[in-house]
Amino acid sequence: MNRLAGQILSIRTHQGTSLVECATAAGTLTSVVLDTPESAPWLAVGQKLSLLFKESEVWMLPGGARFIPHCLKGEVESIHEGELMARVACRTQAGRVTSLVDRTWLARLALTPGAEIDLGIHPAAVALQKEEP
């Protein structure tokens, strides 16, 4: 599980669902939350929190592509290949982000340690966890 520190920048709410935009040290990510500031008082601009997302929810494209919305810039730190899948650890300004990709996609990307990479995370895949004081 990936975990990045963040802070709520903005909240848009409609019919019990909120799009919560959060700043991290590596860029901005958005989360879909099935709650509102009225029903969950911790959903407030300025609230510090953790953004959580699974390794299988991280998309990768070569650095500079920026075709992915909700994208963080990173650098490949290490690649561990298995029979079917590969675990790619990337350094970002917000900390390490790990992606789990199939080996076919890894071969197409032709990644090596030190390569620049863009990392995308779909808003529905990002969970928010309030920081306790």
Positions of the model-derived regions?
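Short, acidic/hydrophobic/Gly-rich beta-strand patch recurrent on exposed beta strands
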Residues: 19-25, 32-33, 87-93, 100
